């Protein structure tokens, strides 16, 4: 007996063990590499590539991040001088080679501009809820121009309003200022040292650029993107047509040249829809100047962004190489391109003629390949598939009906001649899919709501615990309900109906996504096209399987000819008339005892046709159990699984593997990477005042999208994996509800500001953050002990609170070891106000000590203003930002705050002194 069963064993049959093992292997084989790609940075090469020196780049990064260097600091000036020195040391061999033999053209010409002449007055609305402000800024940018072999040889840069001839150049940008609370390793130290290595690379023999390359070391990005704004006043801003920033397909395709591409259009659409509140220089280069480009940036961990952990200890040479290699690959593609895509007429007025461009779709595949195509292509393919796929399913259904093999939606078959009805039970399993999917999807959403109410910030440090909880809950519940439905109402059509429902649902989602892509230019739902394509093919296979079934008429005649009418069999069904004539009195009184011999529907009792004794053993009707058992075993030998419809024995037993491979891999690769990308970039946004429910809801939605390919097969799973996942769910649920959400590795970010009122000499320190953790942090600060801490929610940070107390006096006036904490107006600021007689105008002269940043606030809005000697650009109208020991209050907060607290800046400066004035 055992050997007979072994011979019949099929390793890919649609039976519990093959389904459980193969499905598990497929999911693990795809999910594990996706996790590795998202969590592990590609290793740097052991030997330096030609034109690159990684050891030198790492030393440069360590020097650059040796201290905080915001724009308004002396350390910033030191960094500026150091950069000039490094640039000159790199290009010195190039200059010397040019002096030896200017005719050889072995090395390109390099020009360095220390731009301390450009200035600009403009307005900036800031980010989020910040008010509109007028800004005056003086440039300290460093600009390096590497002449391309095809560039205009004339010295147009020295002429007033000079413009180059020929094709536009390429701009690569990074800012060398940091925030006042961070060392700036990833924001943007790695970018700066990458520019230095790009300079070395393109001045190495054999790497000469065909197009001109402009390397912009801009200063002042952290406050209103000032460095990028003032670059618009330099002649080289008219020369460049492209830069590094994700926007359109023509530029993005060059990013595919890199060895380890990583990214998705989802991030760009997040900025476009306002979901991400921060901004980069992209809004200036593209939105104002009209350049087209690509952005390379770090997205995680956000808890270290703009804090003192943004240093070389918390990054690596591998991360440096990842950005540097991507920069080299993309830039090399741009400077070598000879087409005219970036030299046509621009869409906007007063912008660089960089061509119109087109919206694009892009995503990486396992960090090794990069797909790029136009949004219009996505729209066209989506529309075609939305029409063709339903048409193919419809035509296949018609052919099945014509050949009398359409068992789907068929409740019974009439016998020719007699008119008797033979039950087919083809409608069984139709409605279970949407019901179970709705319930299984509701559970993660309920869990999201539960976490938001009980422990809303657990995702800050434990995103994979949240993922595990939702995945395990979804799979276990779907398995339990599907197995229960299959036990009471087994159906060979469960898989076909499941894929049909998935087909319908993804068709609707693709329609919505196609409309958004066409009307709003949103491409983040690109994965739905591939999701729907996989669902369509899997569904079509289920319909094609039906051609292997006997004709319904043949099955009906065979059924009535094999056995007398009785109630003994659950598998072979007699007509209703025969049932009534052969039924015993006891069964005639109870219609439910007739089992499945009447026409069933999805609303019929789940216990029909399968009566149990008090010991829960199944019994049969008149005719005896022996007859039923012999008949069932005979049918099962032919291929019918347990108590499924007897006509299903001819269905192929291997096609489920093909369906799994058509749907699951593409979903896991595209949706899985999006899910991890989304949570990595958003899991810590709670500290910025964003509701974490959005993150949990996204996890719930992506959990459903990732698990749906399992559902048509999940009723065949053995109990082992679902039971294990149930235990995982219990453990992760308890952890997520009770665990402390922050840790030294995943700190809660708070925002510091100290305000000095020169009128009354008061000094107020404020921290903005999440309650109740903010109060706990403040209670650990000595100077706040015993004080009346005032808190309010009137902040530009959304859901955060701002708490204030009287803090230690700052020492921002002193230089070196000199201390000067006296709050006297004349020591901090001098000013003179002259009002124009007879006009609503005034002249204000102001000078602050030991600072080059100044802010004027008015009680009423100012119609217009002008800074003496400032340039004005009609593209940016003027109406419509120190080290330890200087600010003792900040040092105190850093010293005594819990280890799970991080400090970041709350405003343009860390200390803001105010003095009231009156214009008379």
UniProtKB/Swiss-Prot annotation:
GO terms of molecular function: metal ion binding; metalloexopeptidase activity
UniProt keyword terms in alphabetical order: Glycoprotein, Hydrolase, Membrane, Metal-binding, Metalloprotease, Protease, Transmembrane, Transmembrane helix, Vacuole, Zinc
Biased composition (Low complexity): 559-575
A cellular component annotation (GO) from this entry: vacuolar membrane
Region span, Disordered: 556-605
Main location (coarse class): membrane
Stretches of the chain found on the membrane's Cytoplasmic side: 1-20, 400-433, 485-495, 542-659, 715-720
A Pfam family assignment: Peptidase_M28
Topological domain ranges for the Vacuolar compartment: 42-378, 455-463, 517-520, 681-693, 742-920
Reported cofactor(s): Zn(2+)
Localization annotation: Vacuole membrane
Membrane-spanning residues: 21-41, 379-399, 434-454, 464-484, 496-516, 521-541, 660-680, 694-714, 721-741
Broadest EC class assigned to this enzyme: hydrolase
Function: May be involved in vacuolar sorting and osmoregulation.
Cross-referenced PANTHER family: METALLOPEPTIDASE M28 FAMILY MEMBER, VACUOLAR MEMBRANE PROTEASE
Protein name: Vacuolar membrane protease
